[in-house]
Regions:
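Conserved ABC transporter NBD signature motif
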Residues: 60-72
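The feature captures the beta-strand-to-loop junction immediately N-terminal to the Walker
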Residues: 37-39
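Conserved coupling/switch loops of ABC nucleotide-binding domains, chiefly the family-specific signature
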Residues: 58-61, 219, 251
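Helix-to-loop junction immediately C-terminal to a conserved catalytic motif
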Residues: 52
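Glycine/charge-rich catalytic "coupling/switch" loops of P-loop NTPases
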Residues: 233, 261-263, 267-315, 339-356
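ABC ATPase nucleotide-binding domains
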Residues: 84-86, 90, 94-242
Length: 356
């Protein structure tokens, strides 16, 4: 439904130019929810702005619903107002001099061909019912809470029944509790409408919870994409592992590798562990073993197959505790149930659930 091929964008700078996008390729099928996730400056918002028609790419092409809306080689650049999209900005961009009805109705009033007044009213009220704001149609925008303004912004983006919905960090201005609530509401809204969605965020929780596909961006490129569980559980590199939650890294050398399983001798002679691997590895190759804090099982008595560590720090977090453990020269993080009670300086034994 949305197809992007070879997208590039360079901004002029005093020292010659900054390449914000370095060949972006991806597709979103009809009804899909695709998230661009990354730190500030990675290129995610530039990609969305190119799709919206707010930026003109230097290279590559963009198609929405089979229609080419940007093609640098052919000189095609369809203006934003002629693209079949809905857009929600980070700031919501609710017009303060209008009431809720007028805010949502505006896209219909300026579109061509014009709609009859009765049709506009019906479409606006339908959109407001979708977001639970039908009783606020006559409320002034300045008298809305942050969550209500966000709902109005969603209604305005959907009122034209666009082929593609673009969301530019729409939850980032909300407090933590409201952000979590709105995350569920947004999922339900998109599920009910079936609209194809491109979502931009730096928040890994939003990306993992809502997306069909997550694409992690860094340095103007997509460094890994896939289903949320796959990208989180099987990161391709340190960049992805570090950005998506907490990650532990252990250096080692491959002892043996076959049938998707590698035996790795950890540096410092601490131990040998067995880990899954999608790469073709040769004995003697240096590797990073990457695993999550929740993949570490911790106990206070030695058991066959466990690895001895020293507890460096314990941080109580309510339902769980986080341990910082020293294994040789490496520091590891582990999520531990409060029933396991240790203090800094104690010995502990761990099992790494690398097969997960």
């Amino acid at each position: 439904m949305l197809t992007i091929r070879g997208l590039t964008k360079t901004y002029a700078t005093p020292d010659g130019g900054f390449q914000a996008l370095k060949g972006i390729d991806f597709e979103i099928p009809q009804g899909g929810f695709y998230t661009l996730l990354g730190e500030s400056g990675c290129g995610k918002s530039t990609t969305l702005r190119c799709v919206a028609g707010l930026e003109e790419p230097d290279g590559g092409s963009i198609s929405i619903g089979g229609e080419v809306v940007a093609d640098a080689e052919r000189g095609v650049q369809v203006p934003a107002f002629d693209r079949d999209i809905g857009l929600v900005f980070q700031s919501y961009a609710i017009w303060p001099h209008m009431d809720v009805f007028a805010n949502v109705a505006y896209p219909l009033r300026v579109q061509r061909p014009r709609l009859a007044a009765a049709d506009i009213k019906a479409r606006v009220m339908e959109a407001l019912r979708l977001v639970g704001m039908e009783d606020f149609a006559n409320r002034q925008a300045t008298k809305l809470s942050g969550g209500q303004q966000q709902r109005v912004a969603f209604a305005r983006a959907l009122v034209r029944r666009p082929k593609l919905l673009l969301l530019d960090e729409p939850l980032s201005n909300l407090d933590a509790k409201l952000r979590e609530q709105m995350r569920f509401e947004l999922q339900e809204l998109i599920s009910r409408t079936g609209v194809t969605t491109l979502y931009v965020t730096h928040d890994q929780s939003e990306a993992l919870a809502m997306s069909d596909t997550v694409a992690v961006m860094a340095g103007g490129r997509i460094v890994q994409s896939g289903a949320p569980r796959e990208v989180y559980g099987r990161p391709d590199n340190r960049t992805v592992a570090n950005f998506l939650g907490s990650a532990n890294f252990l250096r080692g050398k491959v002892v043996d590798a076959r049938d998707g399983l590698a035996t790795v001798a950890l540096d410092g002679g601490a131990t040998t562990i067995h880990v899954p691997s999608r790469a073709t590895l040769s004995p003697g190759a240096s590797v990073d073993v990457i695993f999550r804090p929740e993949d570490v099982t911790t106990c206070l008595e030695p058991v066959d197959g466990t690895i001895e560590c020293i507890v460096e720090r314990v941080v109580f977090q309510g339902g769980m505790s986080e341990y910082q453990l020293r294994l040789g020269s490496a520091l590891l993080r582990a999520v531990v149930h409060p029933s396991v009670s240790a203090q800094a300086g104690d010995r502990a034994w761990i099992t790494i659930q690398a097969e997960r």
